[in-house]
Amino acid sequence: MKSNAPTFKVAVSKRSCSSVRKTSKKIRSGMIRKPSVSSRYRKHEGVNLYMSKVTPTSIPAPPQVLVAYIKEKVKTLNKSEVLMSLGNSNQLSSRDVKTKTKKKQINDFIAFRSYYSRLLNGILTQTELSTIISKHWTVDKQTRKNWELIAQEYNCDASGKHFFNWLEVNYGIDKQWLYEIVQYEECLTPTTKKPYVENIYNSGFKQRIDSPNQKDITFSQSDNSADWLVDPIFFDTEFLATSFDRTNLIISDCYSLMNSV
């Protein structure tokens, strides 16, 4: 005869429900221990950035090969246009990245190049800049390390700023070395002396000089050409009145000089 009773008993110990506590996500997030603030830790909005190396406190100095090239290039440029380009470099593409648009990640070389491309806009062409900084990049290890840390920090930043504007806010853009180059080259440029205006009542005469054929040429004989006439008002030094030929005085020129004074 079949029976539904169990043939043996098994003792099963059930875990108490009180030992398992469910916590909400908000509580669990608050229980996470925050890292201690140190020189190797920078806190950004929504991002905790850990650096294995200390980031630079300022933008690294420009390469010497780039400085030397700029000094030679500035000699061929208009100084006022160069100063205007330096003043407008902070105003180019100053818009922030849209919140809906994902910010592009940059590497160390792109960060290095985009900084100098924006800073030297109007001074060097893109071809000149790429040639110079690419050669320096391959040989200078410290430059690569510094810009690698700067690029990593920018990629973890959530402010949504363009790289150059982000550098200006967090590091500051130093243009003093560029202004010093422009002003130094401007001091070396020889200045043109202004014409010396003499008193027309004492020495405002035309001087008659010798012609190539060793004959004196007067104003009437030269077909109204003033190539052989030297006007003393364009001299830097004052001449005595006796050194001019008073017989070659042109009245119309004197009137024009008097009206211009």
UniProtKB/Swiss-Prot annotation:
CC annotations in GO: nucleus
Coiled coil feature spans: none
Subcellular location: Nucleus
Domain of life of the source: Eukaryota
InterPro entries in the record: MATalpha_HMGbox
Annotated region of DNA binding: 101-158
Gene Ontology process terms (BP): positive regulation of mating-type specific transcription, DNA-templated
Keywords: Activator, DNA-binding, Nucleus, Transcription, Transcription regulation
Molecular function terms, GO-annotated: DNA binding, bending
Pfam families, per the entry: MATalpha_HMGbox
Keyword Metal-binding: no
Function text: Mating type proteins are sequence specific DNA-binding proteins that act as master switches in yeast differentiation by controlling gene expression in a cell type-specific fashion. Transcriptional activator that induces the transcription of alpha-specific genes. Required for mating as an alpha-cell.
Additional facts recorded: There are three genetic loci for mating type genes in K.lactis. MAT is the expression locus that determines the mating type of the cell, whereas HML (containing HMLALPHA1, HMLALPHA2 and HMLALPHA3) and HMR (containing HMRA1 and HMRA2) represent silenced repositories of mating type information. The mating type is determined by the MAT locus, which contains either a copy of HML or of HMR. Diploid cells are usually heterozygous for the MAT locus.
Family, per entry: Belongs to the MATALPHA1 family.
Name of the protein: Mating-type protein ALPHA1
Organism: Kluyveromyces lactis (strain ATCC 8585 / CBS 2359 / DSM 70799 / NBRC 1267 / NRRL Y-1140 / WM37)
